[in-house]
Amino acid sequence: MDALSPTWPDLAHLTWPEVARAVAEGADTVILPLGATEQHGPHLPLGTDTLRAEALARRLAARLPGALVAPALPIGCSDEHAGFPGLLSLDAATLAAVIVDCARRMAAWGVTRLVLLSAHGGNGQALALAVERLRRELPDLRVWLPAQTLAPDDAALAVAAEAGIAPEEFGLHAGEGETSELLWLRPDLVRAEAAEAGYRGAMATVVDTLQRLGLKAVTPNGVLGDPSRARAARGERYLDARAGALAKELLA
């Protein structure tokens, strides 16, 4: 299970003099994790994407000199999950405005690079809007939106393939991939006895449908994939593989 470490400098745990000293000593980067509050099948908590975003951000910060991790934004753009109780969601323009407002304040106290790290694919439109505005309104702030944060990345899928986990099992939502990661991060929040397969076809073929009609049109239980073979140890490997790929992309 993950625990906080001095190598994962959470901004919210620092005092203002500590932040000032960190910036003076070269901490010029902030990683802003973006999650969601939405259903993740009958077995995972609504905050799954937020927990995953925080974990990825900390792992990425450990690989990036001078990086601080901002508190995760726990509500994203999740209207495709309408019909499942517990949903909290923002319009894309609202989330983009929140990101821009936070970035302005960061730039004012010395941040010169912002990493937008989303663990929820539905945040894509808001992130694109935010990046467009930031590049126009804060040209001195370098903004990085990783290509691999909006979908299962090749690094995690490679780990799955080594274990004999097919992409249809790994899934796009609450499948083996996310369930394994939550078993590593917060096993106390996983209702393993309730885990069951959902849609298990080719994931790429349903993306358009779920974006237009919502997940309920594709999977009544909210699962895209099959969590039955999820394992905590593999979840740790997924997270490390994702973070390594992100760091490689950023440092290229």
Regions found by a protein language model. Give the residues of each.
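Extended, histidine- and acidic-residue-enriched regions that form the cofactor-binding/catalytic faces
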Residues: M1-V115, A119-A252
